[in-house]
Amino acid sequence: MKNLIFIALLCWGGMTAWAQSSEETNKERAGYEQPYHPEEDGDKRISELLKQAKKERKKVLVQIGGNWCIWCLRFNHLVTTNPELKTILDKKYVFYHLNFSPENKNEKAFAKYGNPGAQFGYPAFLMLKAKGEVLFTQKSEDLESGKGYDTKKVKKFLQGRL
């Protein structure tokens, strides 16, 4: 009987901790910009951005994920609010958020470019040449530190030296 009570308390404590963690994540998520657009045709948008990248002599950096993904929102927040990272991003890339969610899995875009998020988790990144060729993929995990991102690692990634 003592074992049953212990197990019940352990389960209750775990559920309470998970609920608090989920609530904290939802509060954090609400404080960030929502850069993903589930209604958008990702393949069509990437085609437009490739033309822009060619004209501007840039690469296309595709961040794959969704507004449901706290790590996706954290990365976007870092690179768009840190002046040094934002400068690199704006100078070298056309930056795009390719949505992956139940509402829109962007299957056509993923059939063309692959979906590294399915292998690595989200966010995942695609670096595209202006001609549409995939230069490389990057998993988010390599850039993370604690509950956020390591600014030095992200800088190296954006500079193409990671």
State the predicted function of each range:
Residues 37-40, 74, 103:
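Short, flexible loop segments at the rims of nucleotide/cofactor-binding pockets, characterized by
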Residues 47, 51, 70-73, 87, ...:
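Solvent-exposed, polar/charged alpha-helical surfaces in well-ordered, non-transmembrane soluble domains
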Residues 1-22:
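Bacterial Sec-dependent N-terminal signal peptides
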Residues 20-40:
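N-proximal helix/coil linker or "cap" segments that precede and/or mark the start of modular domains
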Residues 40-60:
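A short beta-strand-turn-helix
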Residues 83-85, 90-154:
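Thioredoxin-like thiol-disulfide oxidoreductase module
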Residues 64-80:
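Conserved redox-active cysteine motifs that mediate thiol-disulfide chemistry
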Residues 160-162:
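Short, solvent-exposed mixed-charge patches
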